[in-house]
């Protein structure tokens, strides 16, 4: 007898967009049921069922096996769970007596004990079609009413019945549906006398179809919150690029996942007086700025409880006040610090990089792919024009991230205003290679193993550009050598460095230490 699990995760959810891969405590939502099912040791394999290769690739990162993409007719919101499961039973050629477990991609509250209890119950009751989970309604449906045409009781006969006298009713918890393959093949109804329902506490159950319920489920998976004022200040000038904002948004997200309140402030002025007025003695400050001077950092540290600075290059001793925490997640950052001081606490290297899991996926090798991603940040229009001019006759399609679209651009160019992370990840995945500045996008190109040419556009980018090149991850180029370098760019995976380079594994510990939690 075989036992398999299938995680259903279609990409067209309507109430919460992309709910199955929404970030949930530093993992895509669908990672939770996959990991729990694998850790239970009950199943031969855990499969991902989806209509999206993006979802499939994310799921594979967490150990799921790949089924063929679902047919469109089974990927819309009219397709039922039983229809999808019946399709997969035939696809996997399961025997009637085999066991299949259906899980939903958004089942973040699933636990191993739920699966083991269901598996044991099904095996003990051979005539049972399914075992699923349920939970009592928090308020009795017998006392429910509608508001159409005034207040209308749904069960008028119980309008005066004491609540303690009302029969307990249950709802489907949606965590799992475990059954015989034959029952799924024949699409036997789940809610019938041939099924067994396992009762769960309401604290173990949450439907996240609505955003409010998503927030509730976050509270359930993390039972307490420690709240404190955390303020993040980052450069947001026309000439500062987009990297400061992007990495601070990710830091903010990590902090919130620790149950801590945080706010992001965009630094667009020549002084910090307005921001400084809002800083209190209990505040934890994080800054990511090239525009602040040494005096500014002393003023901030004097008013705040603690200060962390994000930087890309070492500053002289005394530039920051004593007890400042210094975060630099440049590749091999420690190698470039020559005057380490006991006055500061350092967090150096890619282990502290804030990883976005949406950029981690297996990249297929496709030498026929003619799509090229170009991303230089938000301010390098002159260089961008030169790159387009060099490549416009190379028989490729250029996908350019830029806040500006020129008049009458070449036919092989496609311009995109700054994209959100999910959109950027999808575009990156669709391209065979990239030409990028040496800013924060380097790390996402590395995570996605996108063959790339690197063109530093600022002095602070040179160090990390050289480090990535020294490891054979990317090649540094220039406008003079771009045409030749592009011709020689190999569309292949480079697994050697990928196996030894770990991004982001130390960040949570550093933030916990900084925030004293």
From Swiss-Prot:
Question: What domain of life does the UniProt record list for this protein's source?
Answer: Bacteria
Q: How many and how are cofactors bound here? A: Mg(2+) is required for pseudaminic acid cytidylyltransferase activity.
Cofactor(s) for this protein?
Mg(2+)
Spell out the catalytic residues.
Answer: 244 (proton acceptor)
- Please verify whether the record's keywords include Metal-binding: yes
Enzyme Commission no = 2.7.7.81, 3.6.1.57
Q: List the disulfide bonds.
A: none
GO-annotated molecular function: hydrolase activity; metal ion binding; N-acylneuraminate cytidylyltransferase activity
**What PANTHER family does this protein's entry cite?**
HAD SUPERFAMILY MEMBERS CMAS AND KDSC, N-ACYLNEURAMINATE CYTIDYLYLTRANSFERASE-RELATED
Assembly description: Monomer.
The record's comment on protein family reads: In the N-terminal section; belongs to the CMP-NeuNAc synthase family.
Q: What else is known?
A: In publications, PseF (HP_0326A) and PseG (HP_0326B) are separated into 2 separate ORFs. However, these 2 enzymes are fused into a single protein in strain ATCC 700392 / 26695.
Q: What does this protein do?
A: Catalyzes the fourth and sixth steps in the biosynthesis of pseudaminic acid, a sialic-acid-like sugar that is used to modify flagellin. The N-terminal part mediates the last step of the pathway by mediating activation of pseudaminic acid with CMP by forming CMP-pseudaminic acid.
* Entry protein name: Pseudaminic acid cytidylyltransferase and UDP-2,4-diacetamido-2,4,6-trideoxy-beta-L-altropyranose hydrolase
């Amino acid at each position: 007898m075989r036992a398999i699990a299938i995680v259903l995760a279609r990409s067209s959810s309507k109430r919460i967009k992309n709910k199955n891969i929404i970030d949930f405590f530093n993992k895509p939502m669908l990672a939770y049921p996959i990991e729990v099912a694998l850790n239970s040791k009950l199943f031969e394999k855990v499969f991902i069922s989806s209509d999206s290769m993006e979802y499939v690739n994310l799921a594979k990162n967490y150990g799921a096996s790949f089924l063929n993409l679902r047919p469109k007719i089974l990927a819309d919101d009219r397709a039922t769970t039983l229809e999808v499961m019946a399709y997969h039973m035939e696809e996997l050629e399961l025997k009637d007596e085999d066991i299949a477990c259906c899980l939903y991609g958004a089942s973040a509250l699933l636990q191993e004990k739920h699966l083991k209890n269901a598996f044991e119950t099904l095996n003990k009751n051979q005539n049972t079609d399914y075992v699923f989970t349920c939970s009592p309604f928090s308020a009795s449906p017998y006392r429910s009413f509608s508001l159409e045409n005034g207040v209308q009781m749904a069960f008028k006969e119980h309008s005066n019945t004491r609540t303690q006298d009302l029969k307990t009713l249950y709802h489907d918890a949606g965590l799992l549906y475990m059954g015989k393959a034959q029952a799924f093949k024949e699409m036997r109804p789940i809610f019938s006398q041939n099924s067994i329902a396992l009762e769960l506490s309401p604290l173990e159950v949450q439907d996240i179809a609505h955003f409010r319920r998503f927030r509730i489920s976050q509270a359930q998976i993390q039972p307490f919150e420690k709240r404190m004022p955390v303020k993040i200040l980052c450069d947001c000038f026309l000439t500062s690029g987009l990297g400061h904002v992007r990495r601070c948004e990710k830091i903010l997200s990590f902090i919130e996942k620790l149950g801590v309140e945080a706010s992001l402030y965009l630094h667009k002025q020549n002084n910090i007086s307005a921001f400084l007025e809002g800083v209190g003695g209990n505040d934890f400050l994080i800054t990511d700025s090239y525009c602040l001077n040494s005096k500014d950092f002393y003023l901030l540290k004097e008013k705040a409880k603690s200060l962390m600075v994000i930087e890309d290059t070492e500053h002289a001793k005394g530039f920051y006040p004593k007890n400042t925490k210094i975060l630099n997640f440049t590749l091999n950052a420690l190698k470039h610090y020559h005057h380490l001081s006991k006055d500061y606490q350092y967090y150096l290297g890619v282990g502290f990089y804030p990883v976005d899991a949406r950029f981690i996926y297996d990249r297929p090798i496709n030498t026929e792919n003619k799509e090229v991603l170009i991303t230089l940040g938000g301010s390098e229009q002159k260089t961008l024009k030169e790159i387009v001019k060099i490549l416009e006759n190379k028989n490729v399609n250029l996908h350019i991230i830029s806040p500006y679209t020129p008049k009458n651009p070449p036919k092989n160019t496609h311009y995109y205003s700054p994209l959100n992370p999910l959109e950027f990840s999808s575009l990156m995945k669709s391209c065979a290679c990239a030409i990028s500045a040496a800013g924060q996008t380097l790390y996402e190109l590395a995570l996605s193993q996108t063959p790339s040419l690197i063109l530093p556009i600022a002095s602070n980018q040179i160090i990390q550009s050289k480090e990535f090149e020294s490891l054979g991850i990317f090649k540094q180029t220039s406008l003079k050598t771009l045409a030749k370098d592009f011709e020689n760019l190999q569309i292949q995976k480079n697994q050697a460095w990928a196996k030894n380079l770990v991004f982001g594994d130390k960040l949570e510990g550093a933030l916990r230490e900084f925030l004293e939690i």
